[in-house]
């Protein structure tokens, strides 16, 4: 069994009790497959393990696999064999009619049944990789849940003398992983620039609107493959900061992602491209309470409503993949606490996250096989981290944020943000 069809093995006599023979077969046709010839007698029960070089077994019925001169035993197929979307249990049968010239018995493929597949597992290598690719696209979009500090630093004016308008730039990176039958492990870097306009300023609050554009570059690992990730995000922001320490940050974002992937399945390399689109509306509220010595605590709450969809695609193996669109709501409750002086601020933080939607459905089809996979990404995870900001001059501040998160199946291995904001 080496992936090459039409190979033969010839034996004089074969005492095959307890033995296993490995054969390659094209499941789409009943001709040209591997063939075993036993010119003399065959005794015992021999297992034939068939490995398909195609996506299904629907076309292989009737293919002759073994020809025997004098049959005194039997051939069976006791082990499952893997095709593109399902494992199959194969049934062999023998005949003495119209057999191969010079032989008395032919063993052929009589029938097959699909092994059961469910949301808990028993998916094929192809199915697990494709499920990881489409699910990983969703997790990539979900991981972009942002905060006001990560985007603008200390936005309350405590480290800036003039905060009317501002230009900001930042870099960020993240690594996340999720354990399931559709394994995904991703990391990326993202670079973003933005501009803020002062909309209104009173004695009690400041109201700023802004726009930002981000470019993402990363990679992902699946069960037996990898993906090259690219992303583009346009964001609109509406931020109100009150003098008493409260703030409300609203965001509207649209993202487009490209995933050029490749994986190994059915003994060969398979590649393709999976694109996806996501839209989100988010609201974040916080209330910084600070004492006269500079110590502060800031409870926060955030919700993000989102719509996500994977584009349909067909990989180089001929498997067509369609993802159903999904709506979700992401929630975060947390706090940061630290110390703030006229020159710098430092803090520690902790957060609780939950995905209240995340019901992701992928439909795969090839030849006559069709598989509908449901994966529940309704994860809960906790994060902790630290950060700080530094006033470089009257209008310029630098800031950073570090975070790590852990959940039952989803882990945020690390996350970092570094930014600069110039106010004028």
Regions found by a protein language model. Give the residues of each.
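Long, charged/polar, soluble alpha-helical segments
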Residues: 120, 124, 130-131, 305, ...
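Solvent-exposed flexible segments
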Residues: 285, 297, 302-308
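Outer membrane beta-barrel transmembrane domains
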Residues: 201, 291, 320-424
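Outer membrane beta-barrel translocator domains of Type V secretion systems
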Residues: 116-297, 402-403, 408-410
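Short secondary-structure subsegments characteristic of cysteine-rich extracellular domains
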Residues: 56-72, 184-199, 320-326
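Solvent-exposed, glycine/polar-rich loop segments of beta-barrel outer-membrane systems
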Residues: 10, 122-125, 129-132, 181-187, ...
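Extracellular beta-solenoid/beta-roll
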Residues: 1-47, 51-111
């Amino acid at each position: 069994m080496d992936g090459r069809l039409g190979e033969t093995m010839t034996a004089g006599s074969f005492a095959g009790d307890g033995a296993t023979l490995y054969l390659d077969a094209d499941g789409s046709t009943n001709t040209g497959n591997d063939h075993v010839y036993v010119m003399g007698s065959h005794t015992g029960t021999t297992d034939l393990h068939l490995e398909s070089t195609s996506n299904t077994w629907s076309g292989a019925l009737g293919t002759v696999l073994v020809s025997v001169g004098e049959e005194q035993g039997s051939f069976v197929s006791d082990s499952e064999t893997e095709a593109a979307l399902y494992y199959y249990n194969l049934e062999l049968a023998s005949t003495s009619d119209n057999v191969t010239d010079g032989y008395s018995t032919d063993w052929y493929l009589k029938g097959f049944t699909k092994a059961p597949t469910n949301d808990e597992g028993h998916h094929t290598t192809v199915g697990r990789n494709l499920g990881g690719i489409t699910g990983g696209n969703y997790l990539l979009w979900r991981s972009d849940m942002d905060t006001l500090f990560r985007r603008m630093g200390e936005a309350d004016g405590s480290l800036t003398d003039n905060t009317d308008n501002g230009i900001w730039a930042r870099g960020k990176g993240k690594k996340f992983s999720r354990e399931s039958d559709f394994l995904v492990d991703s990391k990326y870097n993202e670079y973003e620039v933005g501009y803020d306009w002062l909309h209104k300023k009173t004695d009690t609050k400041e109201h700023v609107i802004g726009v930002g554009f981000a470019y993402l570059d990363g990679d992902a690992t699946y069960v037996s493959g990898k993906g090259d990730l690219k992303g583009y995000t346009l964001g609109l922001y509406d931020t109100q900061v009150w003098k008493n320490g409260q703030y409300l940050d609203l965001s509207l974002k649209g993202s487009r992602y490209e995933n050029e992937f490749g994986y190994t399945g059915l003994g060969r390399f398979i590649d393709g491209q999976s694109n996806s689109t996501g839209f989100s509306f988010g609201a974040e509220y916080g209330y910084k309470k600070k004492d006269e010595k500079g110590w502060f605590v800031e409870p926060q709450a955030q919700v993000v409503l989102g719509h996500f969809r994977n584009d349909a695609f067909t990989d180089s193996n001929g498997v067509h993949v369609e993802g159903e669109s999904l709506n979700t709501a992401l929630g975060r409750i947390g706090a940061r606490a630290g110390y703030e002086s006229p020159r710098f601020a430092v803090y520690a933080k902790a957060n609780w996250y939950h995905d209240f939607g995340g019901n992701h459905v992928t439909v795969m089809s090839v030849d006559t096989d069709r598989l509908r996979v449901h994966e529940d990404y309704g994860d809960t995870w906790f994060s902790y981290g630290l950060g700080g900001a530094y006033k470089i001059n009257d209008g310029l501040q630098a800031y950073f944020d570090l975070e790590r998160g852990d959940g039952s199946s989803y882990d945020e291995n690390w996350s970092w943000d570094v930014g600069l904001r110039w106010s004028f």
